């Protein structure tokens, strides 16, 4: 077996650690959050363009081979960009910004595809997921300690994402990537320990429930082979959970005043009160968006109306509102496609697909963020491991005199 050359080791190291770290920073919205908080002077668009350029260039020197399944995943983002930038069926003062945001996401999507088309794509995607989790939970802890302010909702911590509803989604998706790519149960449990405070500090109701289901299923299905380790983890985790609960409880107090919003959220999570787990405001927003979508059910009102005028907090209703029945069928069809493939391959990427689908009834706009693209492309690469390499080769000119001599000789 040939030993890798110094150049091979260098380009693979840059791919895994530099490009993977950049994708993790993009997934965690580290550039946007740090810039808006006044920590970093680098504008997010400059970081995005630099990351895309570096990832594509480094991928090209690592001999990429494309997973054709990612083209199916790219269909919905491409349709939404075409609808927003070219058709412009929904016209508003924010439409240019919406089109620019979708274009930015398509560039990030291409960069992720390029990186995950290389031979070391599994290590790179794994490091991207780990770094995104560390950045997200770390920024939330810094915010809790009063070192910096990111959140847009007082009383709930958000980290770089700025809105506390996004960190639980990101952390569960990144855990899904880790479960799909890493077979090391102890390392995966360590990453669960990283995710728990990141979700808890947001006081997110759906986030805590989905994290508990995801991690609970993973631990139970692997408990038999790791019983001794789990027993040790339980002994350590119980007092830590007690401390965590006390910290969360103290977070509902602001001096002598009690934050009713966070207190009610915490009570609903502790008691599994499904009536309190529901949000009356979200139910009203969903009904308003549903009524608007019903006015143009076939083709929708155009990309951009969801998130600017209406906030259905439901990805299916959001896409129905924007793209009509074709968009809804395309979105639901993508999930059916991934689920079918996962079942046929013995449950490959099952945790990741669950993490992706679980939040679709509880939020909107996830298809416009880097961590969703990273998770979707990773799922496609895991489920369809076959790769195709496109090369440009020139056919060598045939020596006519040589051919003529052969023909004469045969005659």
Predicted regions located by residue number:
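Alpha-helical transmembrane segments of multi-pass inner-membrane proteins
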Residues: 122-149, 161-222, 341
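Aromatic-anchored transmembrane helix interface
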Residues: 41-51, 70-82, 90-114, 124, ...
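N-terminal signal-anchor transmembrane segment
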Residues: 1-62, 75-88, 139, 356, ...
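Hydrophobic transmembrane alpha-helices and their immediate junctions
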Residues: 185, 322-360, 386-388
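Transmembrane alpha-helices of multi-pass inner-membrane enzymes
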Residues: 24, 53, 351-360, 365-411
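Membrane-interfacial helix-loop-helix modules of multi-pass inner-membrane proteins that assemble, modify
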Residues: 32-37, 81-94, 127, 131-167, ...
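Long extracytoplasmic/lumenal interhelical loops at the membrane interface
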Residues: 150, 157-158, 270-323
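A membrane-periplasm/extracellular boundary helix in multi-pass inner-membrane enzymes
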Residues: 138, 222-271, 291-295, 410
């Amino acid at each position: 077996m040939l030993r890798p050359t110094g150049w091979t080791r260098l380009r693979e190291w840059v791919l895994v650690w530099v490009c993977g770290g950049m994708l993790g920073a993009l997934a965690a919205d580290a550039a946007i959050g740090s810039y808006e908080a006044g920590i970093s002077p680098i504008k997010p668009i400059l970081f995005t363009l630099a990351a895309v350029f570096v990832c594509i260039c480094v991928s090209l020197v690592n001999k990429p081979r494309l997973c054709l399944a990612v083209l199916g995943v790219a269909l919905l983002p491409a349709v939404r960009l075409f609808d927003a930038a070219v058709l412009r069926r929904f016209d508003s003062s924010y439409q240019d910004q919406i089109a620019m945001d979708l274009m930015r996401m398509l560039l990030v999507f291409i960069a992720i595809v390029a990186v995950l088309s290389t031979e070391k794509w599994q290590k790179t995607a794994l490091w991207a997921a780990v770094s995104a989790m560390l950045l997200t939970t770390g920024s939330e802890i810094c915010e809790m300690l009063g070192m910096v302010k990111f959140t847009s909702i007082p009383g709930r911590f958000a980290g770089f994402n700025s809105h506390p509803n996004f960190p639980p989604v990101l952390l569960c998706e990144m855990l899904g990537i880790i479960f799909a790519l890493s077979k090391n149960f102890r390392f995966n449990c360590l990453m669960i320990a990283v995710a728990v405070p990141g979700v808890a500090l947001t006081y997110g109701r759906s986030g805590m429930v989905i994290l508990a289901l995801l991690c609970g299923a993973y631990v139970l299905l692997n408990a038999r082979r790791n019983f001794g380790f789990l027993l040790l983890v339980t002994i350590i985790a119980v007092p830590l959970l007690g401390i965590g609960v006390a910290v969360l409880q103290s977070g509902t107090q602001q001096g002598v005043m009690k934050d009713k919003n966070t207190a009610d959220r915490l009570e609903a999570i502790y008691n599994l009160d499904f009536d309190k787990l529901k949000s009356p405001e979200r139910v009203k927003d969903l009904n308003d968006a549903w009524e608007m979508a019903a006015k143009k059910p076939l083709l929708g009102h155009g990309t951009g109306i969801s998130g600017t005028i209406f906030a259905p907090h439901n990805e299916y209703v959001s896409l129905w509102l924007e793209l009509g029945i074709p968009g809804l069928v395309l979105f639901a069809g993508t999930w059916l496609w991934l689920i079918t493939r996962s079942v046929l391959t013995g449950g490959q990427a099952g945790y990741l697909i669950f993490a992706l689908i679980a939040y679709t009834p509880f939020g909107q706009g996830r298809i416009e963020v880097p961590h969703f693209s990273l998770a979707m492309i990773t799922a496609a690469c895991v489920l369809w491991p076959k790769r195709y390499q496109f090369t440009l080769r020139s056919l060598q000119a045939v020596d006519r005199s040589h051919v003529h001599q052969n023909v004469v000789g045969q005659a």
